[in-house]
């Protein structure tokens, strides 16, 4: 065999291997696309970091119902409360990135938890944003037994009597962060009293054992409607439809004090974009339904629409803010 023939044979063999590898690559890509087109082929779990019955759980179940209808496959809630919502996030972060495990995230889960819990073992980069869901406004309130009845009176009294007013907060939760942030922005001396849970804060607020609190409008509206609490202001970007006489913090002279209780769906990092996009479209479609809108109303929740990139941009602004609040608060994990 001539030297030229040997070289030609080796070249042909190499070319054959290249063609084979390319074909295998195309087949693998085609298989991946087909698998994503077939998604979902089995039930999907949505991990909710709070116990059954609470506002976040209700929100999760509402979304699961809408997603089940849109995707044609069961989507169910898996309640995993504990460790300041970091337990649920840790489970989700370590799940297979195949679209069959989703997490209903919030500021508490994605920002505050990793900032307060050293053993959280995850951070925001452990997830890929999928879809925004809804936001609920906060309201700052005073006990009827407190020596103030308006925001201006709060500021004046706190400056005239440093350390005499107190603020009840659920330890390590978003209202704790907001109270600490409010103190910093207004430069007033009020004492933060920590509680194990928001229900205990509300009980003592109604009983007059504490003076001030900040909570979501969904929790406070019944007491506000009955006149059992005094509304002082809302850190919302606009006045609330159900509380039109309550001014925003910007109107009251604290323009940077803007925050809401938001929720959104995230998936383990590495989840294929095609699956992320498919779930995103399903969430948006479910949120747009009149039946969903009607069920959001009693929760004081406003649907949030957008692409995965919109949610990523939203988180890029929100997460650093809440992480900074967590550090400012000096809160310690229970």
Give the positions of each predicted feature:
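Sec/Tat signal peptide C-region and signal peptidase I cleavage site
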Residues: 29-35
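N-terminal (or domain-start) structured segment
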Residues: 35-126, 163-165, 171, 175, ...
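Short secondary-structure boundary segments
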Residues: 106-107, 144, 217-218, 236-237, ...
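An extracytoplasmic/periplasmic, membrane-proximal ligand-sensing/linker region
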Residues: 38-43, 251, 273-334
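Short beta-strand->loop
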Residues: 123-132, 168, 189-193, 211-212, ...
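Bacterial N-terminal signal peptides
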Residues: 15-29
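N-terminal secretory signal peptides that target proteins for export/translocation
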Residues: 1-13
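Hinge/capping helix and adjacent helix->loop/strand transition within the periplasmic-binding protein
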Residues: 94-100, 115-200, 249, 262-295
């Amino acid at each position: 065999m001539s030297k030229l023939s040997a070289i030609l044979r080796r070249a042909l063999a190499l070319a054959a291997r290249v063609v084979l590898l390319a074909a295998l690559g195309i087949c693998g890509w085609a298989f991946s696309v087909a698998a994503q087109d077939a998604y979902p082929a089995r039930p999907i779990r949505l991990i909710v970091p709070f116990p059954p019955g609470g506002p976040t759980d209700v929100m999760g179940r509402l979304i699961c119902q809408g997603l089940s209808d849109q995707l044609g496959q069961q989507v169910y809630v898996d309640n995993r409360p504990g460790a300041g919502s970091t337990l649920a996030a840790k489970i989700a972060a370590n799940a297979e990135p195949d679209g069959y495990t989703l997490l209903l995230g919030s500021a508490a889960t994605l920002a505050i938890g990793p900032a307060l819990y050293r053993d959280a073992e995850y951070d925001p980069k452990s997830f890929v944003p999928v879809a925004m869901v809804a936001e609920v406004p906060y309201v700052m309130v005073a006990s009827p037994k407190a020596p103030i009845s308006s925001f201006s009176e709060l500021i004046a009294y706190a400056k005239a009597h440093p350390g005499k007013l107190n603020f009840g907060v659920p330890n390590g939760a978003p209202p704790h962060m907001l109270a600490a942030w409010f103190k910093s922005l207004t430069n007033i001396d009020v004492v933060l009293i920590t509680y194990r849970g928001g229900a205990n804060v509300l009980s003592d607020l109604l009983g007059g054992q504490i003076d001030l609190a900040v909570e979501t409008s969904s929790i406070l509206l019944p007491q506000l409607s009955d006149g059992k609490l005094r509304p002082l202001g809302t850190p919302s970007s606009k006045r609330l439809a159900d509380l039109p006489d309550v001014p925003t913090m910007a109107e009251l002279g604290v323009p940077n004090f803007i925050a809401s209780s938001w929720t959104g769906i995230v998936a383990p990092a590495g989840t294929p974009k095609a699956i992320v996009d498919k779930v995103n479209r399903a969430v948006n479609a479910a949120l747009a339904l009149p039946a969903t809108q009607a069920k959001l109303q009693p929760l004081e929740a406003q649907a949030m629409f957008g692409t995965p990139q919109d949610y990523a941009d939203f988180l890029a602004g929100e997460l650093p803010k809440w992480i900074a609040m967590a550090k400012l608060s000096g809160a310690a994990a229970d």
